[in-house]
Amino acid sequence: MKKILIISGGISKERAISLDTGRQVAKELKKNNYFVKIAEPNFQLFDVIKKFKPNKIFNALHGQFGEDGYIQTILESFKIPYTHSGVISSSIAMDKVLSKKIFIKNKILTPKFLTFSFSKDEKNIVRTIEKKLKFPVVIKPINEGSSVNVFICTKKDIKKKLKYLEDYKKIIIEEFIGGREIQAAIIGSKKLGAIELKPKRKFYDYQAKYNPKAKTEHIIPVDLPKKKYKQIMKISSKAHN
């Protein structure tokens, strides 16, 4: 029987979601006759790995330390296969500003943006946005996932919403682009397909993703013309690779 170590929990703002992911993964793996152990990414992790001797490691961590190259660096040292992208890919993908710069260089469309520093830019934020972008805008942390602390802001409420992000030294501000929410799944070079998400809330935020009461509709397969579907998968694959 193959042994799988699931790492979940962690210290990010997505800890609760990570723990839930770990439990769900463990449940499914056990159904398929794997011997499973769940561990936290703490100082005991090294001992757990050495004693358990897993055949593979399932990274169920979300957010900082779990998706940004840190845990990947640690796992590389054990030379045990693990799920997730490698060190460099993880560190780049978790940084929204760096990712967008790479997209722009490779001619992949991405919303216009600017970075915002609380120590330098707060007084002139409205003027800067009106000069370089236009309202409404989307504000978000540079290196969080799961739509944690993501807000759509108007000129009227931008300063109020910024207060929720004061713990971050820098954030990213993007132009708002309305429309349908389509997500494409890529693993390696394989295109798995796309789905449409129809949230009942203002947009596909943290609550829409994880609160069952939000009743977000998942449409599979996505209802799109073939040409448009192929275009989405092509762009997604280019961004991924």
What residue ranges belong to the model's regions?
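Structural signal for conserved beta-strand scaffold positions within catalytic alpha/beta enzyme cores
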Residues: I38, N59, H84, K112-T115, ...
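Phosphate-binding site of ATP-dependent enzymes
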Residues: T154-K234
